[in-house]
Design a protein with these regions (language model features):
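Substrate-recognition element of Asp-dependent hydrolases with the DxDx(T/V) motif
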Residues: 95-110, 114-146, 152-158, 164
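Short acidic capping loops at alpha-helix termini that bridge into adjacent secondary structure
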Residues: 90-91, 150-154, 182-186
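Glycine-rich, phosphate-binding/catalytic loops in enzymes
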Residues: 25-30, 146-148, 174
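Generic enzyme active-site microenvironment
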Residues: 10-12, 131, 188-189
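Glycine-rich phosphate-binding loop signature in dinucleotide/nucleotide-binding domains
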Residues: 2-4, 123-126, 177-184
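N-terminal helical cap/lid subdomain that shapes the substrate entry/recognition surface
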Residues: 3-111
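Conserved Lys-Pro-Asp/Glu-containing loop-to-beta segment of HAD-superfamily phosphomonoesterases
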Residues: 164-190
Length: 190
């Protein structure tokens, strides 16, 4: 076995390997057409996407701080976007949320050269793992559908660990899981 400087490599998934912004925008565009939001909200998808992105950031921050739960995050970001277009249909917001979470993990855009880098590191026999704040089921679907599941020994989600990055406890959880010390590991992303 080849001796490596680090015993374990940890990666973030979204915004590091999996191109969240591209995949999310493509998902929202699918929803925009599927639910005919161009007729109900605005004919300008770019404006609709910008509005959604604004509310999504606000609701994720509220979720990270513990002000709202997972279910509220999922549908209220959609509802608040619709409200900006004078649509107060809660059932539509909940449908959007369901469909968004169904469609998003089917998108497979990765950042450039990710596969090549992961293949190189695997050939060097680095044990690789993911630490992600995403939802358990959704993250595993993204990984499988993108064909990168073969690279990672452990997928550690905030939902599984019970704590979100950047809190130290999620990294301690990962170290315990891999039986490593911080000096033996490197975190890539976030």
């Amino acid at each position: 076995m080849k001796q490596n400087k680090y015993d374990q490599l940890f990666f973030d998934l979204d915004h590091t390997i999996w191109d969240f912004d591209t995949n999310s925008e493509a998902t929202l565009l699918d929803l925009y057409h599927e639910l005919k939001l161009n007729e109900q909200a605005t004919a300008d998808f770019h404006h609709f996407h910008t509005t959604y992105h604004h509310h999504n950031e606000i609701y994720w921050e509220r979720f990270r701080k513990g002000y709202i739960n997972r279910e509220e995050l999922r549908w209220k970001r959609m509802w608040r976007t619709l409200v900006d277009y004078k649509i107060t249909d809660e059932s539509l917001a909940k449908l959007m949320s369901e469909r968004y979470l169904e469609i998003l993990p089917t998108k497979t855009n990765l950042f450039a050269n990710c596969i090549e880098v992961l293949e190189y590191l695997k050939a060097k026999e680095y044990p690789m793992h993911l630490i992600t704040n995403g939802f358990e089921i959704t993250q595993h679907q993204k990984i499988k559908n993108s064909g990168i599941d073969r690279f990672f020994t452990h997928v550690i989600t905030s939902e599984q660990a019970g704590i979100m990055k950047p809190h130290a406890a999620i990294f301690e959880y990962a170290l315990n899981l891999t039986k490593s010390t911080a000096s033996q590991c490197v975190m890539i992303g976030d």
